[in-house]
């Protein structure tokens, strides 16, 4: 199964995306929640056999250190722990400013380019806004949290993960048939019935394809909330 998803520009870009979902000041975000979502994303990439760059793994190890210290009993205040968190948040804030300036310059460049050259035509599905202002990466991040829970269930149940091959076309047909009966379904409900991680991954990719083709419509009522598939647009 060949899978290609557009990546973030780096670990700080991913962290900024996660932090921005909370709609609060960077220094007010629940840092442990953000760390868990980052780690879920990395683990899901690995399960799906997608390449993970070294800088993402380095950041993951640093975040795991912060998380582990956060979860330890607070017998003595750890100055080093506070420094690690403060340093991380300052880096995210600095990257946020850098990205804003970079985007402003890129916009100016695009405006000038219209007068001097034919604009380059590009079609990147992986970075496209699908529906309800949701991008593929928004759905993938929500999916990675679901995958983390599913992996925990399979591990607890001592489930043997077999190398089953699931055709995306078959999964697309299955989702469409289910929507014919129920009109609205949540991806979490479908995933609960899956027996292997390969099946979960195939269903997710089938859902993305159906959304892209506007065969089904996607809805997420809140950040990090359940992913809902609808037969018809609201």
From Swiss-Prot:
Q: Which HAMAP family match?
A: ScpA
Annotated function = Participates in chromosomal partition during cell division. May act via the formation of a condensin-like complex containing Smc and ScpB that pull DNA away from mid-cell into both cell halves.
Name by which UniProt lists this protein: Segregation and condensation protein A
Which is a Gene Ontology cellular component entry for this protein?
cytoplasm
Output the GO biological process annotations, alphabetical, semicolon-separated: cell division; chromosome segregation; DNA replication
Q: Which organism is it from?
A: Streptococcus pyogenes serotype M49 (strain NZ131)
What interactions and quaternary structure are annotated?
Component of a cohesin-like complex composed of ScpA, ScpB and the Smc homodimer, in which ScpA and ScpB bind to the head domain of Smc. The presence of the three proteins is required for the association of the complex with DNA.
Q: What is the lineage of its organism?
A: Bacteria, Bacillati, Bacillota, Bacilli, Lactobacillales
Q: Does the keyword Cytoplasm apply?
A: yes
Q: Which NCBIfam families match?
A: PRK00104.1-2
Q: Where in the cell is it found?
A: Cytoplasm
- Keyword line: Cell cycle, Cell division, Chromosome partition, Cytoplasm
Which family does this protein fall into? Belongs to the ScpA family.
Q: Which Pfam families match?
A: SMC_ScpA
Q: What's the chief localization of this chain? A: cytoplasm
Statement: the UniProt record of this protein carries the keyword RNA-binding: no
């Amino acid at each position: 199964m060949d899978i290609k998803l557009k990546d973030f520009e780096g670990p700080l870009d991913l962290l900024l995306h996660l932090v921005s979902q909370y709609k609060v000041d960077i220094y007010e975000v629940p840092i442990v929640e953000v760390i868990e979502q980052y780690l879920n994303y990395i683990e899901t990439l690995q399960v799906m056999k997608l390449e993970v760059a070294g800088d993402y793994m380095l950041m993951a190890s640093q975040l795991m250190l912060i998380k582990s210290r956060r979860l330890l009993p607070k017998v003595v205040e750890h100055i080093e722990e506070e420094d690690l968190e403060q340093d991380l948040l300052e880096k995210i804030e600095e990257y946020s400013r850098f990205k804003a300036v970079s985007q402003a310059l890129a916009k100016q460049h695009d405006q000038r380019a219209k007068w001097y050259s034919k604009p380059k035509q590009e079609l990147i599905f992986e970075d496209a806004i699908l529906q309800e202002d949701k991008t593929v990466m928004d759905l993938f991040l929500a999916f990675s949290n679901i995958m983390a829970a599913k992996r925990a269930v399979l591990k607890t149940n001592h489930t043997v993960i077999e190398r089953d091959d699931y055709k995306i076309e078959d999964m697309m047909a299955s989702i469409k048939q289910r929507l014919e009966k129920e009109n609205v379904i949540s991806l979490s409900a479908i995933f609960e019935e899956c027996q292997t991680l390969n099946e979960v991954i195939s269903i997710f990719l089938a859902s993305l394809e159906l959304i892209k083709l506007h065969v089904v419509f996607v809805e997420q009522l809140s950040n990090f909330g359940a992913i809902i598939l609808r037969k018809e647009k609201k």
